[in-house]
Amino acid sequence: MRSILFLLLISSSVFSQRVITGKIVDKENSTALSGVFIRDTKSDNWSISDKDGAFQITIPYLEDIVLNFSILGKMESNIALKNNENFITVFLEDNTLRLKEVVVTANKERKYSELTLGTNAINNVQAFSLDDVLKQLPGQTTTDFNLNEFKNIVFRTASKLSASNANKAFGTSFVMNDIPISNNENMQALNPNSGLADDFGIKGNTFTNTNRGVDLREISTNNIEEIKVIQGIPSAKYGDLTSGLVLITTKVGNSPYRVSASIRDATSELNLTKGVKFNLNNSMNFGINYLDSKADPRDNILNYERINGNISWQYKNNDATIKNTVNTSFRMNLDNSKSDPDDISAQVIKNEKKGFSISNNLMWKPKNLWVDGINVNASLSYDRQFSRRDKWMNTSPSAATDTQEEGIHEAIIVPSQYTSVSTVEGIPISTFFTLETTKTLTNKSNWIHSLVLGVSHRTSVNRGEGRKNATQEMLNFYTLSREGNSTIGFRDYSFTNSKTEYQISTYFEDRIFKKFKDERILNLDLGVRFDNQMGNISLQPRVNSSYTLNETFRLRAGLGLSSKAPSLNQLYTGDRYIDKLIGSGIYTYPGVYQKAWIQTIITPGDNLNLKPSKAYRTEAGLDIKLPFASVNLTGYYNKLYNGFSGQKVPVYRVIPKAEIIVTGTEIPNYNIVGTEKFYYMNNSLTNDRSSEDTGIETTINFKKIKSLNLDVSMNASYTHTKDFSDVKEYESSASLTSAERYGVYNPQDGIMDSFTTSFNFNYHIPAVGLLISLRTEHILLQNTKTQTSNYPNGYLDSELVYHEIPVEDRTNIQKYGHLIKVRNETQSKIPNILHNLHLRVSKDFLNGFSASLYATNFLNLKPYYYDDYDNKILSKIAT
């Protein structure tokens, strides 16, 4: 099918070309600018200016040409050429606050629904990490400033702390310089299938982010040139995602030394960047960032440190047909929770990550081949992760075992006081490679087809020592004391037991442009992506379109499918060890003996049947350009299905029945007296999670009030979310003698909605380089409702055979009162509108020095509300 389409395009096409030449000049001093990157916005053909600022670019069509000009330190410029204009002179201005127009908010692109944040928008919030920048987007809110827990983000959803939210965060893709940032190989979890939450964290702050997306704290903003956010339908070029795409472009090129320091509460940050131009064809940029953040300025108990460094080298040949960029970076992140002298039982946590990445981006315009361009991207990422938790235990004596074999074993008697130590060591390694070709064709009717064909390959592997015991040989043991308990015993597990996860993909895209006689314009991107993710094959069509009716109205629409592969931590969890104390527990005769026996049951643990989660995304929009404002309105419906979900299913094993023999002061022993059924809950991961997000968002940019030098903009977002699962819930019968062993219930569905607005007021005086920005946030609606299912649909008997209960009998207390649960439906909402206001004052001086003061919640608003239990709650937006 692809070959037929390709031949049809060729047969109806003519190779119309137009050569554009020109010169690029620095507006400040009228000197020529070399190394400026020139890109055709439709075909992605490109060129680079020479030492005299001159350039030449071949355009494979004749009319409606728009060229983009960009270089580090200058304001990016788009210039539309007249149909008879083949030579242009371009003036680029310094990107400072002395520009006549400064954009400090997310800019809605005129093609589809993507949002772009430039340098000024990135600096608008004095960001300490990428998380601070993305909070400016519609539907997001600024929460308490806290760098002592991992940060992720989800777009276009009202779900917060839920399994669906974790799925969506895991499915949000971050791509830096055309290289995806992967979290698939992160396995820093103590017991992936145990149900134990927050393996490494303290006081509600979770450090590790397995299965929950990229930790945005690790990405500093000092070296970022531009951020593009696609909340709708991504290009077919991008895969392994379900919930959104963030494209990051870093700085490369000549620039002066830039030293910056930021201080906020007990957080301080220091940045150094410099760009060097060795000659006409070679330039280098390097930067280093250090951040130190304490949870409390009065002590150093909870602390986060980050050190990032990067070196970028860019080369181009003399005739500007090859552009190659090599990026290397190193990183160190440390979460450190030290011992609290006032709390001997407090956990001591250390979570450390050190690593490096190297990538190469090659752009080549071959002269003697049929294609216009060939792009090759490759990368390698290597990290060493170490997580450790120390906790002082003061409990009654207990028994444990470290055996890795089934059967009855003599237990280790754990003293009532000891230090429990849990450690996980990982070495995540990821690679990525993509090869892409481009070709632009036009036909006699001036239809422009920009064709893209590419293949990609990515791998994820972890070669760490894994979960292991440290010192004292009695660490983090969990022992069952009764039947039915789902707690799992801890055992060593090497991550080398996991296999390499691979993804092989190919994609094709036809980007169509047509301008009609009456100024109507059609943009249509037709793409398809083929993914092979660990043997799971999927075909993902994606469509984006826009139709400009006139200078006032433009329609937009798009739809597409995408998928996200499971992580290694979800696939490879290790065997589950169920430890059952036999007899009456620990047998003690003071001064003579202390004995206990544990029966160990082993069940396979890996979730190798887990498949990629998938998403179906649609959106439709309307852009209106009025004399006083530009309005962008977008409605969307997104569905996540085959999402990752935990499941607990009752199982039983027939095991030997042991009888303990105790005779006076003699050492106790046991005899096998038959068999018995042992019931327990088996934990696993399945593809049974689903979620639907329906919403509408708008962005309005008002015309500048020139008499006041005031720019005003606003955005609003409403989202309705429904989370649901196909995983049944099981609960033991309240009657030990009944034939019904477990009740079977529907899962708890969640319904949420959220309505937020934000206003931006920017007062700008270019002559003195002064900018005063006021950003307001308003939460008008935030509701959460969790539906309960107290009445069983059926039950499992002693053989765990399912029996359906007739609908009319499910509420019958006489028959099934021992299975009916008493659990109220939970619902929460904010009774009043919550407000937050942030102020920034920035000044650029002529000597290159700049200063900025940024205050969040500068009016010190303290919005309280009361929950369903009449507890007074302080909203998290009070930063």
Q: Where does each model-flagged region fall?
A:
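Outer-membrane beta-barrel transmembrane domain signature of Gram-negative proteins
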Residues: 406-411, 415-521, 693, 742-747, ...
